């Protein structure tokens, strides 16, 4: 089953700022795998939010929540150096975002 991946504006802005084309390709490939049900290296961070780890320097993190079996909402992204701040931001965004808004 292919999952639908939705992105918040915060996530889109973060991804657009990435200057490293290899990192962008790695993230795109990882999202393709997720859409096909292959989540790989993920870990729950609380309040229904999970962290997707991309093993590339710097170690990128993408925060998401899943609603049902078909929708994944990309809340925000960052790297290891901003991890704590990004987790808090993801939790705040998750509280106010609605699937039908994306």
Locate the predicted segments by residue.
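Generic detector of well-ordered alpha-helical segments enriched in charged/polar residues
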Residues: 12-15, 28
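Short low-complexity stretches enriched in small and charged residues
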Residues: 20-21, 26-32
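A short, surface-exposed loop/turn module that caps and links secondary-structure elements
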Residues: 29-56
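Enriched for short, Lys/Arg-rich terminal
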Residues: 1-4, 13, 21-24, 39, ...
């Amino acid at each position: 089953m292919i999952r639908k991946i939705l992105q918040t504006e915060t996530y889109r802005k973060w991804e657009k700022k990435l200057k490293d084309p290899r990192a962008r390709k790695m993230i795109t490939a990882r999202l393709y795998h997720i859409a096909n049900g292959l989540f790989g290296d993920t870990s729950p961070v609380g309040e229904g939010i999970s962290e997707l780890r991309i093993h590339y320097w710097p170690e990128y993190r993408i925060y998401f929540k899943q609603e049902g079996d078909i929708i994944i909402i990309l809340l925000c992204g960052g790297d290891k150096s901003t991890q704590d701040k990004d987790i808090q931001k993801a939790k705040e965004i998750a509280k106010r975002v609605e699937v039908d808004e994306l």
